[in-house]
Amino acid sequence: MANVLRASGLFIVLLAANMAQAAEFEAHPSLAVSEEFTDNVLESNTNRISDYITRVQPGIAITYKAPILTGDLSYVFDYRNYAKNNHDDEIAHALSAKAELIPVKDFLFLEASDEYQRVSLDATRDTSKESLFVNQVDRNIVTASPYFIFRPTLRMRLKTGYRFIDTRYFKSIAIDKTNHIGYLDMAYEVSKRFSLTADYTFTRETADVDNYSQHQALGGFRYEYSDKSFLFAQAGNAWTRYDSRQRLNNLIWNAGITQVFNTVTCTVITGVKYDEDPLRIIMQESFVSGIIVKNLTRGSLSFSPGYSEYVLTKSNILQTKKYGATVHGQYDFTADFSGGLSVTGEKFEQPLLGSYTRRVIVDSSLSYLLARQLSLSLNYIYVDYYSPKIVTDNRHINRAIIEIKKTF
């Protein structure tokens, strides 16, 4: 809670310091009240216990725009009452605050952000659809980044700066971390549609369990072959050295293509990234993913397949292979009444356990605008797990939620 208050206070101070300038300012308080029924509140595979969860969520959204400062803040205070006392009543927070200061126009910039939210303990598996608390932890990430933009020539753009990232977890075995990052990005415009790119990043991370230093170097191109359609690719290497003297040398890449048609947009991306892992230092993820979006007169349809390999970076051991796809549809029945449906199928292969887990998620919703900025929504979520050998990965959960929300 102290971190949330500090972030909100810093945001307000920055705004107050610039209120004298011509600026746009909006503040919208809100209040949401919801009731949830779940038939497996503890996500047990043998002892299924149901519960009713009442949530009261006052919040506020602030937007500020001025010549040298922009900022957005969204905060929700979340009180949760469990009617059958299967879990202690709790207070949760959701904060997203971002600000950008421009002390010297087109040259010197300062970005700052704070993200406080509840996240999954498992970096390979998002559990937010299944429960409000099982296998989850509260995380706060504070980021501050001063950077410069240089234009040595009309065709060349250089961006260099420093990024400070502090990651904290609360009431958990998760590992706190602090990152100091220096970076240099270069783009050279060969023509209006074709550019060469090069990126270098140095990261120094300190944590309770171990520290490491990492260099990343990438080079490639970006080509816009038609209006809003483009292709990009970068390849390079990452050199990681732990203070415990272990050294790793990994090929990395980042590539993708986006094709825009009249009502259809197709995107495919692939790359290697280092994910924040609550239970470890970092997790290396090699991935291929795509999405096809079809815009309808009153809604949209999308299909998004994906494949990822998660490697325990320090030991260089493959932990999980994940295959999955999501089909999503959204439709506006009237100007005030809309609905949505998502179906996700995933398979998690876990070589270290000699088994796999299959997961299916069905997420459906209806929303009706009762009056101006007053809405009523219904949400039903079904989650089903199956594993031939992992006993705890055989369970299913039904969640039904009704919510009324007023924005002022």
Residue map of PLM features:
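Gram-negative and organellar
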Residues: 22-408
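Cleavable N-terminal export/targeting peptides
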Residues: 1-24
